[in-house]
Amino acid sequence: MKIRHIACGLAFQALCLGAHAETRHGAVEFPVARQLNCYQANDFNWPADGSGIKNPACRAAYQEVYKKHDNNQGQATLQFNQWNEYAKNIADYNDFEAVKKAIPDHQLCSAGNSVPGNDKSGMDVPSPDWHASTVAKDQNQAMRLKFKATMPHDPSFWVIYLSKPSYDPAKASLTWNDLEEVGRFDNVKLVGGYYEMDVDLKDKLGKRVLYTRWQRNDPAGEGFYNCSDINIVASAAKK
């Protein structure tokens, strides 16, 4: 029975990967998004229960989804393998209330995806161990955000948020009220497979969560949402 269950999980994973191979779109490479960091570690395929995952936050994310779906490996690995498809279709995407309804509080880092077959809710699990990229502000108090695009979309716009000092990702999942907008960009040019933006961080310092929204201007209203854990410092430092 155990062998059959694992086989079913792997079959589900293969089915999901095949179904989504042509529709993946990208993720924040710097500061690295949670799901991309977990994916790049490449330590989640075995053992099936995720016990071999080294980063405690990535391991907790995996096991959250694994246990929710009756120890299904395919469900759990999907949130890592689909690192570039943290998306939600919102037809009325210019209405912020519609965005908040589609991506409710405590589901921001999963882009509101928490259903069987597309459950990325492990990214919403509170943990003190999410990898935090060191972000050194330049002389203009800005940081360079790099978004790796596996499929470019234009026209589009970007909204960048930063968590408030009161928010602690170790204790609670992210909510909209935890965020403040720090940047907005229209039709950023794709260069060498990346969208890059200089985000003004002003006087912000310390550990925060950077929340990136990339919104397509199309009838379906497809948008992409990423959480990046960061530590903002005043001068250049090694990440």
Q: How would you describe each model-predicted region?
A:
Residues 154-156, 206-208, 224:
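Short loop/turn segments at connectors of secondary-structure elements within structured domains
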Residues 1-7:
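Bacterial N-terminal signal peptides that target proteins for export
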Residues 22-153, 157-158, 165-168:
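N-terminal "mature-chain" segments and other terminal, solvent-exposed stretches
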Residues 196-203:
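Short, hydrophobic beta-strand segments
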Residues 161-195:
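Exoplasmic/lumenal beta-rich domain surfaces
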Residues 222-238:
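Short beta-strand elements
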Residues 16-18:
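N-terminal signal peptide c-region/cleavage motif recognized by signal peptidases
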Residues 163, 204-219:
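Internal, hydrophobic beta-strand segments that form the core of beta-sheet-rich folds
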